[in-house]
Every structure is written in structure tokens, then in C-alpha cells.
């Protein structure tokens, strides 16, 4: 009979729960609705609870209240992805309920499950039923309904697991997309794995490891460790050049298409934003003076910036060779406003950096950074203010959680894709205050449609589309709109959904697996089918996704 749970027993439960989730992480990942090759729910929940487990193992206590604080802190800082954040919030509420206790009774055990559910629901802006939240809620309700009959904590835990399993099986009836794909909710399955491990711990049993231990080191990659791979002499256009031009009455009439065409002759990485009174330009060029002279044809130059990217690159190489440049570089940086972007791909990181991002965290579709990764970057920058660009919907909650922890005044711009992040960052003005920048950057999100091309990792049917393993899928925002074994056909199908007669600019970001011949084929097709659309092509170097597209 186990009528009480103390810190030592709770630690055993946590360790076995974490191990059971680790053993089943791949299974949980396989339940993800979209068949994209991302490490997602299982990976994120596993990394999150592993962070909590490691914190517990390093700070063991007989006092369950103290151990709960330790576990909650580890989960909070290690939370990755939306599923990881929700898991951390479930146990934040659970552990808050046992605060100050040396040990807890069966009644308190049941009440703690309920407290966790209440905390998690409050943390999610728009709770969706048929998810991990529902499984947790149904399990907690069962615990509260059964607690008076429970013989001990083991008996209660058995009942919690039965209710969670039944709730998990019912998730397809609550969420249509689960029923269409033929899976149960992945987050709910992950939570059930944790609960099953808890029961093992309560009974004094051990979950044997079936998977290699995960490396939970930070994914911070500020200033990029990849500079040494690129030769300075390989930089074709050496000056990152920006200008703002206020249109003049007696100057040349502004035609945006003509302006873009002429500007594109000066270099690459061209970005142009026009608001009828002012045009803002970002371009990498060999001749900044020519860019400024051209801008003066249209009006008054009000803001200019030129940075020598070759010299910046040499400096980074020097620091790396001296052993100065590493993941801890952030500690030496002090900025008034830290602009933190999350991205993956050398080219994308370089583009963000050239546009003013002060810190790059390596992460995205294939690996979500933790709350702690984001917190560390902001705190080590010693900034007064911070702006976070998640650039992925699954990094949003960790970003918001980080913003609530740090001392600096911090805002999260809800960018769900790399193209949205680029558009938002282009609106940043270092002379403006945080609220104005937040407003302008949020407004920029309304002007961008995002698309991407990747491949399917399994057969499925979703949104009415039959998908075969290894087909190329076109996603408009988060919705699969086409699937085809021919990559070019998939791209055409996707762009036909994104482009229309009002489209002006198409930004194409090529991934590390993009084929140059297909890239050229795409550009030729766009120029033929959509002659009024200006194409801007960048080498992003991102894995998994052959192309990102942005339509404005």
C-alpha cells in the first residue's frame, strides 16, 4: 500500500515517466497528422521531460514540494514546441499544488492532476479539444471522481491511466483531421506514456532504456559557427546596403516594378518595401554609392547604412581561430534591443543577420529550441528590450514563455514561417520604440502568403488529398494543397494556389537539397506564366524543405 508520495518516490516516478516517453518518442512522432519529415511532438515532449528529469537527478530531495519546484523549473526551461510547453504547464500546475509539502496523500495526488489541467488550459490562448489537453482533463476528472474509492496512490494511478487511454482513443471523434488521417492525438499519446512510466515508478519497477540518451545541449548558434566553411573571397557582393528614400515632388515618378528591375542589377538579396511616401531598400552590392545615387533620382535619402560583409566575415574567422567565437559569444554582447530570430540554414541565417538580427538561434522545422535557449540569448545580451521572431508556429509558445521569464521588455512577433520573419524584420526601425516596431512588424505579416515544398515520409490522406510516401508536397501556409512525385509539378501546383493577378513579388528561398536545374525551371515558368511578378531568389540552405516561397 502506497498511501503517501515523498520526494524520493516522486523522483522515481519522474525518471521512469521520462524513460518511457523516450522509448516511445518515435511512435509519438509517427502519429503527427502531417507526413512531413520533422522531429515534432514526440521529440519535443521527450526533450522537455528529459530536461526536467536531469534537473531532478541533479537536485534530489526527500521533500516532494522542493522536488516539484525543481522538476517544474527543468520542464519550464527545457520546454520545446507547443506540445512541450503544454506538458511543462501541466506539471507546473501539478507541482504548484504540492508546494510546501513533505509528502502528499492520495487526495492531494488527485487534486494535483486537476490543478495541472487548470494551469495548462489557462496557458493556451485557444484550447482545442481532441488534443493532449483533453486527455489530461479526462484523466484528472477520473482521478477526482475515483479518489474516495482509491485504495492507494497506485490504485489511483491505474485509474488515471485507464481514463487517459480511453480519452486518447476518443480524440479522433473530437478532431476531424485525426479521424481523416486515422491516428490518435500524438500529444495525448505522449502524456499517456509519461503516466504509464509514473505507475512503474510507484510500483518500484524500472523502465529499461530502448533508445540512445538525447543530447539536450543548447541549439544557440549566435553569429553562426559556419563562417569558417565559407571563404571570404567567395562573397560576390561585399557590402550590405540599406537606404530609405522619401519621394520628392519634382523627382522621377516612382514605378515599383521598374525600380526593382533596376535595383536588381546592383546585386542580390534585394528587398524593397514601398508605402507610397517612402521606399526602403536592402541589397547586397559591390557599389553602394551607385545604389544611393540611383535612389536620389526619386527623392531625398533619409537613412543610409553600409556594412562591409567581407570584413565582418574576416573578423568572425579571426575570433573562431582564436577560440573566442563559440556558443557562449552571446555573453560578451550588449545591445539596447536584441532581435532574436530562430532559423535553420546558413543562407537564411546570413540574410537575417544582414537585415539587423542581433542573435540567431539555430532551429525550426527539424528542431525546436527550448525556452531556456531563448532565455539565455536574451539574458546574455544584457539588452533592455527584445524582439523574438519564432518563424515557426511550433516555436510560438516557447517564445512567449521565454518572454514572460526574462527581465528585458520583450515582445514576440507571431511569425509562422521564414518568409514572414523576413518581412517582419524588414519593417524594424532602430529609431522607433518597441510598441511602434511591434505594430509595424505585425502589420507586415498580413501582406505575406507563405508556401513550402517538402516530401512525404508515409502514405496518408489529408485535406482530401491522397499522399504517397516520397511524393513532393506543396504546403500553402500549413495546408497541403498538392502532392506529386514530380517536384516541378508540385511547385507549379503550389504557386498556382499562391499567385494571382494582384501578386507583385515572389521570394524563393532554396534549400540545401534544391536542384539548380529545377530552380531555373521554376524561375523560367514564373516569368512566362506571371510576367508581372518580380522573382527574388535566395540560397537559404535549409534542410528538409527544398523551397520556401513568399508572395506579396
From Swiss-Prot:
**Residues in DhaL domain copies:** 8-200
| Molecular function (Gene Ontology), one example | glycerone kinase activity
Q: Which domain of life is it from?
A: Bacteria
Could you provide one GO biological process annotation from this protein's UniProt record?
glycerol metabolic process
| Family matches, as InterPro entries | DegV_domain_contain (IPR050270), DhaL_dom (IPR004007), DhaL_dom_sf (IPR036117), FakA-like_C (IPR033470), FakA-like_M (IPR048394), YloV-like (IPR019986)
What this protein is called in its record is Uncharacterized protein SERP0792
What organism does the record attribute this protein to?
Staphylococcus epidermidis (strain ATCC 35984 / DSM 28319 / BCRC 17069 / CCUG 31568 / BM 3577 / RP62A)
Q: Lineage, please? A: Bacteria, Bacillati, Bacillota, Bacilli, Bacillales
Amino acid at each position: 500500500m502506497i498511501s503517501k508520495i515523498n520526494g524520493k518516490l516522486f523522483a522515481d516516478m519522474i525518471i521512469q515517466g521520462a524513460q518511457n516517453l523516450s522509448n516511445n518518442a518515435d511512435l509519438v512522432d509517427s502519429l503527427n497528422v502531417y507526413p512531413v519529415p520533422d522531429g515534432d511532438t514526440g521529440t519535443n515532449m521527450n526533450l522537455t521531460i528529459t530536461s526536467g528529469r536531469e534537473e531532478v537527478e541533479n537536485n534530489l530531495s526527500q521533500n516532494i514540494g522542493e522536488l516539484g519546484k525543481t522538476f517544474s523549473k527543468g520542464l519550464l526551461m527545457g520546454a520545446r514546441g507547443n506540445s512541450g510547453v503544454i506538458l511543462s504547464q501541466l506539471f507546473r500546475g501539478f507541482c504548484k499544488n504540492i508546494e510546501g509539502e513533505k509528502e502528499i496523500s492520495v487526495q492531494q495526488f488527485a487534486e494535483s492532476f486537476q490543478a495541472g489541467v487548470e494551469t495548462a488550459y489557462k496557458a493556451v490562448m485557444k484550447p482545442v479539444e481532441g488534443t493532449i489537453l483533453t486527455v489530461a482533463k479526462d484523466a484528472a476528472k477520473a482521478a477526482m471522481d475515483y479518489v474516495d474509492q482509491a485504495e492507494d496512490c497506485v490504485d489511483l494511478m491505474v485509474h488515471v491511466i485507464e481514463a487517459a487511454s480511453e480519452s486518447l482513443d476518443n480524440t479522433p471523434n473530437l478532431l476531424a483531421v485525426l479521424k481523416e488521417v486515422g491516428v490518435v492525438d500524438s500529444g495525448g499519446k505522449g502524456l499517456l506514456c509519461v503516466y504509464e512510466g509514473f505507475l512503474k515508478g510507484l510500483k518500484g519497477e524500472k523502465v529499461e532504456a530502448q533508445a540512445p540518451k538525447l543530447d539536450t545541449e543548447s541549439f544557440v548558434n549566435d553569429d553562426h559557427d559556419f563562417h569558417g566553411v565559407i571563404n571570404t573571397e567567395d562573397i560576390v557582393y561585399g557590402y550590405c546596403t540599406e537606404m530609405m528614400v522619401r519621394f520628392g515632388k519634382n523627382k522621377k515618378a516612382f514605378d515599383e516594378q521598374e525600380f526593382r528591375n533596376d535595383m536588381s542589377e546592383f546585386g542580390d538579396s534585394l528587398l524593397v518595401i514601398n508605402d507610397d511616401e517612402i521606399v526602403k531598400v536592402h541589397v547586397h552590392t559591390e557599389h553602394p554609392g551607385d545604389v544611393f545615387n540611383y535612389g536620389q533620382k526619386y527623392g531625398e535619402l533619409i537613412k543610409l547604412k553600409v556594412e562591409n560583409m567581407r570584413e565582418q566575415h574576416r573578423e568572425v574567422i579571426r575570433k573562431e581561430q582564436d577560440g573566442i567565437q563559440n556558443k557562449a559569444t552571446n555573453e560578451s554582447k550588449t545591445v539596447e534591443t536584441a532581435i532574436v530570430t530562430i532559423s535553420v540554414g546558413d543562407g537564411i541565417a546570413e540574410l537575417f543577420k544582414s537585415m539587423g538580427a542581433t542573435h540567431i538561434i539555430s532551429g525550426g522545422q527539424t528542431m525546436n529550441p527550448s525556452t531556456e535557449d531563448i532565455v539565455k540569448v536574451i539574458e546574455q545580451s544584457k539588452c533592455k528590450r527584445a524582439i523574438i521572431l519564432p518563424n515557426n508556429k511550433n516555436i510560438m509558445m516557447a517564445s512567449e514563455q521565454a518572454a514572460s521569464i526574462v527581465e528585458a521588455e520583450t515582445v514576440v512577433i507571431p511569425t509562422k514561417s521564414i518568409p514572414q520573419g523576413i518581412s517582419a524584420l524588414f519593417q524594424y526601425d532602430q529609431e522607433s520604440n518597441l510598441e511602434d516596431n511591434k505594430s509595424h512588424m505585425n502589420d507586415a505579416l498580413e501582406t505575406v502568403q507563405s508556401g513550402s515544398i517538402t516530401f512525404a515520409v508515409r502514405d496518408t490522406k489529408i485535406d482530401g488529398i491522397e499522399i504517397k510516401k516520397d511524393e513532393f508536397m506543396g504546403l500553402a501556409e500549413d495546408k497541403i494543397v498538392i502532392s506529386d512525385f514530380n517536384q516541378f509539378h508540385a511547385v507549379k501546383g503550389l504557386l498556382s494556389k499562391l499567385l494571382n493577378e494582384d501578386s507583385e513579388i515572389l521570394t524563393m528561398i532554396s534549400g540545401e537539397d534544391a536542384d539548380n536545374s529545377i530552380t531555373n525551371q521554376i524561375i523560367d515558368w514564373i516569368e512566362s506564366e506571371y510576367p508581372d511578378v518580380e522573382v527574388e531568389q535566395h540560397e537559404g540552405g535549409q534542410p528538409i524543405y527544398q523551397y520556401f516561397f513568399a508572395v506579396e
